[in-house]
């Protein structure tokens, strides 16, 4: 949880990190901003065709073209990503964090911003000892993870059968 009693999440809880730093959440915040101020959201609405069609990808594309609303939304998402990651680094003290998924793939500078925020917000020993990198698996992480789990489960059965 990033914000107790915060934004509603797809998991039906509130305040989840994903509800602030996920791609779907970026799109939701953009749609809300465009509905509240259609003039500020004009570039997003035009790009998407309608307010309800605005997605995280729409925001990243508008950001790349210098849209001020998209810049504010992307900056906020980067901050949420970094703050949540700082909490993870404080709690687990990992040697490496690999960031992936649609938000990271849609806007690679998130990784640099996450590093900056972790360095500023996490406990010094943990922050100094962690490497934060972007995944090289792109959209294949889930498939590779599932295949790895299946292989490991098969190998476990195979090993057990040999030793029995």
PLM region descriptions:
Residues 4-164:
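ATP-binding/phosphotransfer module of carbohydrate and carboxylate kinases, centering on a glycine-rich
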